[in-house]
Amino acid sequence: IGIRNLDSDAYKVIKITFPPLPEQQRIVGILDEAFDGIATAKANAEKNLQNARALFESHLQSVFTQRGKGWERVRIEDTCESIMDCVNKTAPKVDRPTSFKMIRTTNVRNGRVNLDSVNYVTENVYRIWTRRQIPQRGDVILTREAPMGEVGMLLSDDKVFLGQRLVSYRANPARLNKRFLLYALQSGDLQGQIRALASGSTVQHMRVPDSKNLQLPVPSLREQEETVATLDSLRKETQRLASLYQRKLAALEALKKSLLHRAFNGEL
């Protein structure tokens, strides 16, 4: 069919309505002043949004770099009940929703495992792919590739299983707080170890054996719980502020569109 386009001659006969020049200048003056104010407000909101996120990130990094007395470094495998990788092939999916969901690397982001967009499989495939272990609420999942180093905690009781390039950590509650593990894997310390262990000249990935040998800095369980409480509280406040600034940015953009609409409908 080709690309539809409007003949250049057609533009010449389009009729537009516009006010006298003094009125145009008045409207332009109003819009320029308003848009300058909106641009300043948006810049401030975006800066505040960045600062809110940076505050949490800064505190998270300080926790794992300015460690107090009693902290030790141990192999992550020694603090977990299990470390489980995926079956080494892609599960055959179906084109309809089922009760059996495959977690992909794209589902793991920013401390969360998002199950809103997943691939589905049959019950039989699910049973085969979970024959070694069924994922459960509280498992911490790490992407080994595409991209490498994203971390999220599973907070669902849905029937899920690991897709390719994922590994899950199940904390031993006698030694390790699961949320402390989540935060530790997001820290610069562990992320640096993951990058150092990366292999592959084109696509960076971490081998399964290396995922078990990460060196985890851990204090006592009591201090882990106190650290988690502080980080959870700060994260919650950061998310509240981020939501506030995002709503403000959306409102400013809506105001800009509203002003343009009013200007070209003779309402200014």
Give the residues covered by each predicted segment:
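Residue-level "contact hotspot" at macromolecular interaction interfaces
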Residues: 131-134, 159
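Non-catalytic DNA-recognition/assembly elements of restriction-modification systems
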Residues: 13-29, 33-36, 40-87, 213, ...
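Short loop segments at secondary-structure junctions
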Residues: 171-174, 188-189
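Short, solvent-exposed loop/turn positions at domain surfaces
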Residues: 128-129, 200, 243-246
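Acidic, low-complexity, intrinsically disordered peripheral segments
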Residues: 259-268
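A short glycine-rich beta-alpha junction/loop motif
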Residues: 1-22, 144, 160-167, 176-179, ...
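Low-complexity, Lys/Gly-biased intrinsically disordered segments
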Residues: 72-113, 128-130
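Short, ligand-facing micro-motifs at secondary-structure edges
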Residues: 1, 88-90, 109-121, 140-163, ...
